[in-house]
C-alpha cells in the first residue's frame, strides 16, 4: 500500500522529550519505520538481532512499551494472536486480517468512513476515534 505521507522523525521527537536514543532503540525504531507489515514483539526481536545480536527480548519489550507510551507506535490486539505493532504516523486506515495466514492488509474506504459518520450522526454522536478490523478468508479461485 502506498502511503502518501511522510513518517515523522520519532527519534528527534523522543530526544526532545528527554529519551536517550540507544543503539537498540534506534534499531527497533528503524524496524518499525521501515516495515509494511504489523510485526509482533518476537518478530521485532528476530529482526533486531539480525542487526545486533546483543539485543535481548526484554530490551525489545521495554522499548515497545516506551514507544507506545510516547505515542510513537500503536498496539493492535487482533483476535487469536499476539499484540502487533505499527508506527502511529500517517493517514487513518483500517485492517483486513487473513484468518488463515495472519497477514494484515491496510485499506482505506471513503464510502465506509462516510457511512460511519452518517450512522453516528443519525444516533446523535460524533466519532472521536474508531478502529475497523475485518476478519476474512481469501476467496477461492
From Swiss-Prot:
GO process annotations (BP): negative regulation of DNA-templated transcription; regulation of secondary metabolite biosynthetic process
Keywords, sorted A to Z: Cytoplasm, DNA-binding, Iron, Metal-binding, Repressor, Transcription, Transcription regulation, Zinc
Keyword hit for Transcription: yes
The keyword S-adenosyl-L-methionine is annotated on this UniProt entry: no
InterPro entries: FUR, Fur_C, WH-like_DNA-bd_sf, WH_DNA-bd_sf
Subcellular location field: Cytoplasm
Region (DNA-binding): 1-89
One CC-aspect GO term: cytosol
Residues bound to Fe cation: 92, 94, 113, 130
CDD domains registered for this protein in UniProt: Fur_like
GO molecular function ontology, one term from the record: zinc ion binding
Pfam annotation, one family: FUR
Taxonomy, superkingdom: Bacteria
Residues binding Zn(2+), per UniProt: 38, 86, 95, 106
Region (Dimerization): 90-141
Task of the protein: Acts as a global negative controlling element, employing Fe(2+) as a cofactor to bind the operator of the repressed genes.
Subunit structure: Homodimer.
UniProt record similarity statement: Belongs to the Fur family.
Name of the molecule in the record: Ferric uptake regulation protein
Organism: Brucella suis biovar 1 (strain 1330)
Gene (name only): fur
Amino acid at each position: 500500500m502506498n502511503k502518501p505521507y511522510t513518517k515523522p522523525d520519532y527519534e528527534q521527537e523522543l530526544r526532545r522529550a528527554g529519551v536517550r536514543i540507544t543503539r537498540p532503540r534506534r534499531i527497533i525504531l528503524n524496524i518499525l519505520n521501515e516495515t509494511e507489515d504489523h510485526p509482533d514483539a518476537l518478530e521485532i526481536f528476530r529482526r533486531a538481532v539480525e542487526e545486533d545480536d546483543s539485543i535481548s527480548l526484554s530490551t525489545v519489550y521495554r522499548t515497545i512499551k516506551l514507544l507506545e507510551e510516547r505515542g510513537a507506535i500503536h498496539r493492535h490486539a487482533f483476535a487469536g494472536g499476539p499484540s502487533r505493532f505499527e508506527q502511529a504516523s500517517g493517514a487513518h486506515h483500517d485492517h483486513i486480517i487473513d484468518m488463515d495466514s495472519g497477514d494484515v492488509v491496510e485499506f482505506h474506504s471513503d464510502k465506509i468512513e462516510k457511512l460511519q459518520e452518517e450512522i453516528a450522526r443519525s444516533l446523535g454522536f460524533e466519532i472521536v476515534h474508531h478502529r475497523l478490523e475485518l476478519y476474512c478468508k481469501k476467496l477461492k479461485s
